[in-house]
Curated annotation (Swiss-Prot):
Entry comment describing in which tissues the protein is expressed: Expressed by the venom gland.
Cofactor(s) in the UniProt record: Ca(2+)
GO molecular function: calcium ion binding; calcium-dependent phospholipase A2 activity; phospholipase A2 activity; phospholipid binding; toxin activity
Keyword Lipid metabolism: yes
Cofactor descriptive note: Binds 1 Ca(2+) ion.
Pfam families assigned: Phospholip_A2_1
Active site: H48, D89
E.C. no: 3.1.1.4
Protein name as it appears in the record: Basic phospholipase A2 BmjeTX-II
Annotated InterPro entries: PLipase_A2, PLipase_A2_Asp_AS, PLipase_A2_dom, PLipase_A2_dom_sf, PLipase_A2_His_AS
Length: 121
């Protein structure tokens, strides 16, 4: 669910996810806006959108799943029916951490060059 997703991102990046990533680039934020992702951070959101689109179980973003942290690693519950959803959220949290250096404030609330046509997954 959104709270769990937010907690993963906060623990990985130290950033408050909804204010930091909520309206960033072409893909970060509810639903994405399409076009070419803006650098690494926005690419994380693009990949996350694609991951959600490929879910075969628990396709809803409000479904809860089990996960823990082992040392500094996110571990999704092995037998959880929503493990795929957890793995998508884990990937974006780790991607955001790995791409903290690509975050550019000029892409906050950036809609100008976002096209309607999505880049195919």
């Amino acid at each position: 669910d959104l709270w769990q997703w937010g907690q993963m991102i906060l623990k990985e990046t130290g950033k408050i996810p909804f204010s930091y990533y909520g309206a960033y680039g072409c893909y970060c934020g509810w639903g994405g806006r399409g076009g070419k992702p803006k650098a690494g951070t926005d690419r994380c959101c693009y990949v996350h959108d694609c991951c959600y689109g490929k879910l075969t179980s628990c396709p809803k973003t409000d479904d809860r799943y089990s996960y823990s942290r082992l040392d500094l690693t996110i571990v999704c519950g092995e037998d959880d029916p929503c493990k795929e959803l957890c793995e998508c959220d884990k990937k974006i949290a780790v991607c955001f951490r790995e791409n903290l250096g690509t975050y550019n404030k000029k892409y906050r609330y950036h809609l100008k060059s976002c096209k309607k046509a999505d880049k195919p997954c």
